[in-house]
Structures are given as structure tokens and as C-alpha cells.
Amino acid sequence: PELMFKLSKRNKIEIPFKSVEEIRSAYNFTNLDSFLKIYYQGSNVLIKEEDFFDLTWEYILRCKQDNIVHTEIFFDPQSHLPRGVSFDTIIQGIHKALQKAKDEFNISSKIIMCFLRHLDEDSCFEVLKEACKYKDKIIGVGLDSSEKGNPPTKFKSLFEKAIEEGFLTVAHAGEEGP
């Protein structure tokens, strides 16, 4: 909540919350859709490489506090690309924070790019094409967002192509049932 509020101010992005406390109360979600609502509102304040660095670094500090020595993080470029944020901006900000984590805390990491289930497979293929430029930084691809009406079979050919490109695959599943 604190970082979301800070980045909204820094980037002059209006959010529907007047304080950190209001954001914190919005985090009392009861189902996947209410979680996704606050998640996407938070995503909207991420604009610059520095923002992605700051978000990743905050996560790394929590990892350090919890004595985590390896982490595999997911990111959703499709949440940002339509707003004009470049794939390079996203991946460089995340990667620089993860490199700093390795250098300063010896926390190792891997990056997994996720496709958004509620979007069509064609838009996911476009993002996969971008991801191929960063195979040195992205270990795998995944699937997340709303499951209702978006079964994994919808993305069968996408995942086949990702595997052909050398990516490992994973998917969030079960948050909303069959």
C-alpha cells in the first residue's frame, strides 16, 4: 500500500484512494476478482524502470527479512504494455533489483512472465515474441488472472510455442475452481 501511494504521487497517477490506510483496507479482498481489482489498480502506477525496480526491491527486502535465499517471481507485461510502458522498461527494472539482491544479499532469483487469461491468445503471442528477446532473463512463462471462461486449453498452442522457444511453463490454477 505504501509503495502504491508513493508511486501514484511520483508519477501523477490518480488512484481511487486518498491514503495508505484506504489502500490497506482495499486489500481485505474476499475472492479472486476483488484481489484482481486492487492488483490492477496497483499496476497502473508502475510507469518507469525505477518503479519496477522499487516494487521488486520492496519484495526482495521482505524475502531477506524472511530468510528466503531463492525466489521465482511472476510479472505481467500485458498489464503495462497497453499503457505505453515498454517491455524493456519492465524487465530492466525487475532485473536490476534482482541483480542487486544477488550482489547484496546473495538471494538468487528467476523471472517468470505470465500471460493474462482474460486476454485473447493472439495478444499473448505478441508478448511471447517480446519475451524471446529476453531469454537470458526470463526462465519461463505462466498463466494468471481470472480463470472463469478462460481454461488452460484456450492457450494450448501458445504454450506449445513457448516450450519450442525453450521456456519452462507453469500456470496459476484453482483460485476459482473448475
Regions picked out by a protein language model, each given a short descriptive name:
Residues 1-167, 176-178:
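Metal-cofactor-binding active-site regions of metalloenzymes
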Residues 173:
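Active-site metal-binding loops of divalent metal-dependent hydrolases
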